[in-house]
Amino acid sequence: DHMTTPPGANDWDITDGSWSLASEPSQQDLFSASAPYNFGHFNDSEITKDLNDIDSAKSENPTYRKAAFVKYQEDMNKKAYVVPTNFSLSYTPVNKRVVGMTLDYGAMDTWSEIGVSSAKLATK
């Protein structure tokens, strides 16, 4: 299975896969050497150091973490490991009688706050 076991050196040229990102801005689950979504089995010591730096205790300081992300992004751009071929947006239609609805990333209680302002169904 090429998704979990690295193929032979000459078995393939391109791997195409997709995933969605977690709300935690860590790239470990996508690009670390043992990541399940690292479909191309990319492994680079400099990127590994960058990933570990992003998630280190020092990165609890937002300024430090931002700088660590910038370095990681620069290194990833140099290596061109990932070439985006697709982009999508999520569309969530909500009518006027829905209250308490938010798609904000920081909202942790959406489903306990959402409701409707009327028992009467919306007609338009």
Swiss-Prot record:
Gene Ontology biological process terms, A to Z: peptide transport; protein transport
Protein's cellular compartments: Cell membrane
CC terms in the record's Gene Ontology section: plasma membrane
SUPFAM superfamilies the UniProt entry points to: Periplasmic binding protein-like II (SSF53850)
Record carries keyword Transport: yes
Key words of the record: Cell membrane, Lipoprotein, Membrane, Peptide transport, Protein transport, Transport
Protein topology in the membrane: Lipid-anchor
UniProt subunit comment: The complex is composed of two ATP-binding proteins (OppD and OppF), two transmembrane proteins (OppB and OppC) and a solute-binding protein (OppA).
Functional description taken from the UniProt entry: Part of the ABC transporter complex OppABCDF involved in the uptake of oligopeptides.
Family of the protein in this entry: Belongs to the bacterial solute-binding protein 5 family.
Protein name: Oligopeptide-binding protein OppA
Name of encoding gene: oppA
